[in-house]
Amino acid sequence: MIKLKNINFKNISVVLLFFIAINYIFFTYRFFQRENGYILGDWLINYEGGFVRRGFFGETIVNIASILNLNLINLTFFITITIYLIFIFLLFKLIFSKKITFIIALIIFSPATLLFNFYDPLAIGRKEVLFFLFFIFYLFFSKKNFFMFCAPLLSMGITLTHELFTFLLPFFFVNRYLECDSFNLKKYKTEIIIALFSFITFLFII
């Protein structure tokens, strides 16, 4: 009988991440090209008819496509896939920088997290991936000086793209608490800045 402690969860994680990425690319392409106009349309909400919620990304990408004379659907597909692959790559690095136990692997690859896309392909290609990418950027770079400059701008941009970001802000504070095991506000400067800019932006769009 194979014991759990003898299983290399990092190698299993690499294989799973590979198939998750392939699955995401395949279904995103199908949805964007022919099968689900709603998912593509959500990314392309813009300010053509006036200021609306979730329009920042769409306004940006529509203008880029217009200026560079690019196919809007293909450009959107390329950018969303790039966002997801960067997330997968950083998650891969995070996994290999930590000791992966059975419990951690189970949490990462449970049907409620990354494997949810296999159970419900219609969840693929959603804007929520922006939160996951920003959060993993935060895990890697929150102690870097450049992140303190970029974080407010990114938090505002993501909130203007999907207001759900504001409701996920507690994850940043929970992570900091788990790191320092303290409620000293001086240690939460990055999290407070992210929350402040996101919340102000949220108040502006509601």
Predicted region positions:
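Transmembrane-helix motifs of polytopic, lipid-linked glycan transferases
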Residues: 78-100, 137
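Membrane-lumen/periplasm interface segments of specific transmembrane helices
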Residues: 21-34, 55, 187-206
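Short hydrophobic/aromatic helix or loop-helix immediately within or flanking a transmembrane segment
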Residues: 48-82
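Perimembrane helix-loop-helix junctions
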Residues: 169-197
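Membrane-interface alpha helices of multi-pass inner-membrane proteins
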Residues: 147-172
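Aromatic- and kink-enriched transmembrane "portal" helix at the membrane-lumen/periplasm boundary
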Residues: 55, 103-133
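Extracytoplasmic catalytic/substrate-binding loops of multi-pass membrane glycan-assembly enzymes
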Residues: 25-41, 48-60, 162
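Membrane-interface transmembrane helices that cradle and orient dolichyl/undecaprenyl
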Residues: 135-148, 182-183
